[in-house]
């Protein structure tokens, strides 16, 4: 069976936090549903950009006017704006979006295992635009154990599908 990462966004948790679900299907067919809140995602993106400073030379906005509303690059990404990451040596540009970063988290978990996920009792997220539509999660991302290096690796998985730097 093929591995797969699917993102479900536009969700609210039971405590009314904005959230995302990363559905990760492993080769043996088992799927886990990992919940990450918007706040956790913003922190991880900030850590990833800090952790990638050895290969990211510059960061550029794709939607320059829209990005002026926010104070950090990670806020821009969380609010579904895109940024360009320029390679420190070649100036080659790579586009980072919220979906790409979330997919990178899932691909990292597929590659390195579920150590960064904590199983939890089933929790519920509701679609913001369709509150009657309920999605269940069975894991949370253990962001307290993710440092800047791991976050950078997740970023690379999101951009390239594999580790390219470091």
Q: How would you label these PLM feature ranges?
A:
Residues 38-46, 50, 102-106, 152-156:
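Generic detector of well-ordered alpha-helical segments enriched in charged/polar residues
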Residues 90-144:
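Amphipathic protein-protein interaction modules
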Residues 11, 15, 45, 139, ...:
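Generic low-complexity, intrinsically disordered sequence content enriched
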Residues 32-40, 68, 72, 76, ...:
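Alpha-helix boundary/N-cap detector
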Residues 27, 47-51, 55, 62-65, ...:
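Surface-exposed polar/charged interaction patches
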Residues 2, 7-89:
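Long, contiguous N-terminal structural blocks used for assembly/anchoring
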Residues 142-165:
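Acidic, proline/glycine-rich low-complexity IDRs
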